[in-house]
Amino acid sequence: MRILSMLSALALASVAAPGRAQPLKITTSIETFASLARSIGGSNVQVESLSRGYQDPHFVEAKPNLVVVLSQADLLVYAGLDLEIGWLPPLVQNSRNARIQSGASGNLNASTAIDVLDVPSAKVDRGQSDIHPRGNPHYWIPPVNALKVAKEIAERLKQIDPSHASAYDANLQAFGAELKAKVPGWTAKAAALKGLKVVTYHKSWTYVSRWLGLEEVGYVEDKPGIPPDPRHLAELIERMKAQGVKVLLIENYYNRSIAQLVTDKSGARLLVMPSDVGATALTKSYVELVDEVVGKLAAAS
């Protein structure tokens, strides 16, 4: 953190520089939001993600160079719901960029547009696990949610850069039309998935399960972010056998050894899934990400 503080002077110099050049600079916490921002901003924006699609968004290393990136941002887009709580807030603070501080027009918590799932009914202690007290933050894959985030990005861009408002509206309309054209194909491909019983490593596929009609039977992690104990795994394996679970979903950034043990003993198939743009060479955009997610699930059903 000392290094972050040392870079604050450079960050401040960047913020204070007059005559800010176009295009507008958008910084995002994950690659999916970067893809959405490029779709909406077009040639009027320059977009950079603070994390890569193959990284766990809960645990991104707060490297000093990210302070400089944030110091130059006109708009920051992040998932919220405490997904980035372990690394993003100190970077934003040390950037000394008034444009992206909490409450500023350049600070966009994308979760405010989402119908949030898994909101705990009782008070939770984050010290015991990676439970999110405000609800599940892994919401960006279903098209309805991606479009909501895209609309929020468009609105913020119009506030920050009203001279290009018509371009942002046109780009949003084009993105919405692209999704409208793709959804019937995704829905048809996923028709056989309705009622499919699955287990997931982390409780991060809830929104996808709700969208595609999957039934989540259990989770390898008994408590989010905490390695499971043998008793939980034994109970999970027996439940999978009893209910005929054939698929276990895991993101490509998790260690697969425990999940592989569960599938070996239960007879299920381990399906390594991309959960963010850039997770694989086949997921270079939001649409490609959904293509890959739906395609892999359909092939495994």
Language model regions located:
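Bacterial N-terminal signal peptides that target proteins for export
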Residues: 1-7
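Extracytoplasmic metal-acquisition and chelation regions
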Residues: 21-301
